[in-house]
Amino acid sequence: LPYFAFIMYAINRGTGFTRALFMNCDHSLLTYSFYKKPDMVLKLFRIRLREIMKINLPPALVIGAGLGVLLYASGGTDNPLNYVVLFVSILCMSMFFSVHYLTVYYLLQPYSVDAQVKSGTYQLVMSVTYFVCFYLMRVRMPTLVFGVMCIAFCVLYFIAACILIYRFAPKTFRLRG
């Protein structure tokens, strides 16, 4: 299961989605003050999260269901809870990366007016994300343990992301020169 953190990272459409948001929406609207009010920022974040999850969810559903079928076909497991945890943890990984890309976009807004990445902090965060996912491929632990930890982490990350966006994005979500 830890391998799939890297796979879910690799298939996530977060970078393209946030770049499209910037070029088609935020580039023009960030000049207006109403667009930076905390309630508005959080509302837009939730709407956009729903939309990016619609993009990232189908592959996660296929992978999660496919893993369950493969587990069953290969002899299964003694604990039927493993099937549920396997499926839900794949969906949570997809949710995590959707939330992560949007959160980093809102908190660091990495794009310049011409849609080029100008934030060194953004590049650092994305590099750390890559290396953590890569490192997870070396982790060896039972599916149930890793899956439950993954699900709990994803839920906590979502809550923390909403709080951070509400508090900080109105100040950090701006046009770069």
Task: Kindly give the residue locations of the regions a language model identified.
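Glycine-rich nucleotide cofactor-binding loops and adjacent beta-alpha elements
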Residues: 36
